Amino acid sequence: MCRLTLAQQPDTTFDQMITKIAAGSHRILSVSFYARRTLTVARDLLGKHLVREISGTTRAGRIIEVEAYVGPHDRACHAHKGRTKRTEVLFRSPGVAYVYLIYGMYHCLNVVTERLDYPAAVLIRAVEDETGLIDGPGRVCRAYGIDLTLNYHDLTTGQKLWLEDRGKRPPRSQIGSFPRIGVDYAGEWAARPWRFRIASVRRKTRKAQVTPERKRIFLES
C-alpha cells in the first residue's frame, strides 16, 4: 500500500491520484498526483514511466533521476525573477509540461507541480528503457522526440506524451538525494539536495541510443 498523501486532501488514496487507461497495471498519472508538494512529487516520480507516442509508435522508459525546483524563493528556479513569457507555463495548473531549450540545442522536460499561480516543477534528468540508460535531460528529450512543440502540453490526457505508474516503486532505501546540477549561480540554493536518483542505477556517460528507424519516427515526424 502506498503511503503518499496529498497536503490538500490528506485522505486521498494512491488509486485516486492516477487514471486507469487499460485493463493492465499501466495508469496515467493524473492532476492529483502532480498537485502536491514538489519534493514529494519528485521522489514519487522515480520508477514511473515516461511515455512518448508518435505516429502510432510508443516508447517508454523508467524514470531514474529528477530535480525539483520549488517556487519563486528558489533561486535556481526559472521563475525566481518573476513571471515572464518564458516562465508563464510554470504558473499554470499542475500536470502541464514545461519544455525549454538550453545552449540553443538541447531540450529539457519538466512537469509542473503544486498549484495554479505557484511556479514549481520537476525536471526529468534520466530514464532507462530497452536501449539502456539515457542519462541527462537533453539526451532524454532527443531520444524521445521532445521539443518546444510540447511546451504547455497536458501530461494527463494520454496523448503524445504522458507519465505512467506501472505498479513498481523503488524502495526508499534505494533513493539518493544530491545537489542539483548546473545551478552554481543560485548561491546557497545550489547546495539543496533536491536532485533525486535511484541510487542502484549507476551514472553513465553515453549517447542516447536511437536506432535508424526509431530516429526517423521520433525525430523527423
Regions inferred by a protein language model and the residue ranges of each:
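Conserved, well-structured core segments that form or line functional sites
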Residues: 14-221
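Cationic, low-complexity basic patches in intrinsically disordered or flexible, solvent-exposed regions
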Residues: 9-10
